[in-house]
């Protein structure tokens, strides 16, 4: 992994400059609440991620949604587009993540991934986006799909994990500006990376090889592999830890969502042993757990690829290529999620967030740090922001953010930790910064 050369500058994080073309209109006057229909350009399907299978609106044999639609009313949040950039590789940007491990007063830093490039930026208060560092993989055919932030538990340095089409996880230290570790094990592309909410060393990866893997990046051990007998039957596209880090929900191309508990005695022991493992004191390799059976599984929520899943308390938010994010829970409404049995066949759909023109796959939504806002972009550059604080979920309010020049598929969004900035990345290599007005 080499760096793009250039001028070093720096706060805490050294800066490396590369050529970036900036959008000529970097301070547009358009507020996100206006001109709902100003975007009308269709974007072509990106060749790097294949087409979604035909999604019939009324597939036979499927029941109608359990509850009514979550109607969108005027949202209390308002955003303004203040800046945009275009990365010079002109390839789709698949991932963006703000570093939420920074302290109050620290620079607001986010990372983007696309092509064989990983780029770090800093958001300045006046709307500027400053390029900090850029890393280029030695293999021109690498295509990074996902990134995730953590920190070194010994030095407190920020660390960034990235992965993509080659199935190699790379850990970058932006302070020393080096790729300090890499992990090989998945048999195919990696679609998402997630760090444990309470343990900065536990990294979850999900792959095209139908499996999930849990790594300990402090001791460089593979703790567990989730998949096999009752695992996913096709690419795993997304996964998320719950807030306490006791459960994982995964989803994929097999239309299924699967729950994996990592607070079982078996998994707690495996994690503990991964910390105690020292290769210099033993000739034996670390024995990874093979978890073949999920603790719950369903195919009753979606009828197409499930490409994004997130926990919201004990509820699940998931989406397919069906123009809706569905809110649901395993079992019946009154059931305790921690007592759900693997044989449970019931699911309770609580409602859905509807939007339009988003029927290609690998389009991921995000929430802010406090889980008060939900954001998703569609394939023609529109952004939808929902207010999750509404007491009645059926009254979740939505703001639609549009800007005429943003007309390409929005692959992912990310909020700054204080929720003041929303960044979106697109298939045409553009980055869009929206600042919150209220």
Curated annotation (Swiss-Prot):
Organism superkingdom: Eukaryota
Intervals holding WD repeats: 88-131, 139-182, 185-225, 231-270, 301-338, 356-396, 405-438
The keyword Repeat is assigned to this record: yes
Residue spans of biased composition, Polar residues class: 40-57
Keywords: Chromatin regulator, Nucleus, Repeat, Repressor, Transcription, Transcription regulation, WD repeat
InterPro entries documented for this protein: PcG_WD-repeat, WD40/YVTN_repeat-like_dom_sf, WD40_repeat_CS, WD40_repeat_dom_sf, WD40_rpt
Primary subcellular site in the record, as a coarse category: nucleus
Region (Disordered): 1-67
Keyword Nucleus among UniProt keywords: yes
GO BP: any one term: negative regulation of transcription by RNA polymerase II
Subcellular location: Nucleus
GO CC field: ESC/E(Z) complex
Quaternary structure annotation from Swiss-Prot or TrEMBL: Component of the prc2/eed-ezh2 complex. Interacts with yy1. Can interact with ezh2, hdac1 and taf9.
The family this protein is said to belong to: Belongs to the WD repeat ESC family.
Role summary: Polycomb group (PcG) protein. Component of the prc2/eed-ezh2 complex, which methylates 'Lys-9' and 'Lys-27' of histone H3, leading to transcriptional repression of the affected target gene.
Protein name: Polycomb protein eed-A
Lineage: Eukaryota, Metazoa, Chordata, Craniata, Vertebrata
């Amino acid at each position: 992994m080499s760096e793009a050369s250039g001028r070093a500058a720096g706060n805490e994080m050294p800066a490396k400059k590369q050529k970036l073309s900036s959008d000529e209109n970097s301070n547009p006057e358009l507020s996100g609440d206006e001109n709902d229909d100003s975007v009308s350009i269709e974007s072509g399907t990106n060749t790097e991620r294949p087409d979604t299978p035909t999604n019939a609106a009324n597939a036979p044999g499927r029941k109608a949604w359990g509850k009514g639609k979550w109607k969108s009313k005027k949202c209390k949040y308002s955003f303004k587009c203040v800046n945009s950039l275009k990365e010079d590789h002109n390839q789709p940007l698949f991932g963006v993540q703000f570093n939420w491990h920074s302290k109050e007063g620290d620079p607001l830093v986010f990372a983007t991934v696309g092509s064989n490039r990983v780029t770090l930026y800093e958001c300045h208060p006046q709307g500027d986006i400053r390029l900090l560092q850029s890393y280029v993989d030695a293999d021109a055919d690498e295509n990074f799909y996902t990134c995730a932030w953590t920190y070194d538990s010994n030095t407190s340095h920020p660390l960034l994990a990235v992965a993509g089409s080659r199935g190699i996880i790379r850990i970058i230290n932006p302070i020393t500006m080096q790729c300090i570790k890499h992990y090989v094990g998945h048999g195919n592309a990696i679609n998402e990376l997630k760090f444990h909410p309470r343990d900065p060393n536990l990294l979850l990866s999900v792959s095209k090889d139908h499996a999930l893997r849990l790594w300990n990046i402090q001791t460089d051990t593979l703790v567990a592999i989730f998949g096999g007998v009752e695992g996913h039957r096709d690419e795993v596209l997304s996964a998320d830890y719950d807030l306490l880090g006791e459960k994982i929900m995964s989803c994929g191309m097999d239309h299924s969502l699967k729950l994996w508990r990592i607070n079982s005695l078996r998994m707690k022991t495996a994690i503990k042993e991964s910390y105690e493992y020292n290769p210099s004191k033993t000739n034996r390799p670390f024995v990874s757990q093979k978890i073949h059976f999920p603790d719950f599984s369903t195919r009753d929520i979606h009828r197409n690829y499930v490409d994004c899943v997130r926990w919201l308390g004990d509820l699940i938010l998931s989406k397919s290529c069906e123009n809706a994010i569905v809110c649901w829970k395993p079992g019946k409404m009154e059931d305790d999620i921690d007592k759900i049995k693997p044989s449970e066949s019931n699911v309770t759909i609580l409602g859905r967030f509807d939007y339009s023109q988003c029927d290609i796959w690998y389009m991921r939504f995000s929430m802010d740090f406090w889980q008060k806002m939900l954001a998703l972009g569609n394939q023609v550059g529109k952004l939808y922001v929902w207010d999750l604080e509404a007491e009645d979920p059926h009254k979740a309010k939505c703001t639609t953010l549009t800007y005429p020049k943003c007309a390409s598929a929005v692959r992912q969004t990310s909020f700054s930790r204080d929720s003041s900035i929303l960044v979106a990345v697109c298939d045409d290599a553009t980055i869009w910064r929206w600042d919150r007005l209220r």
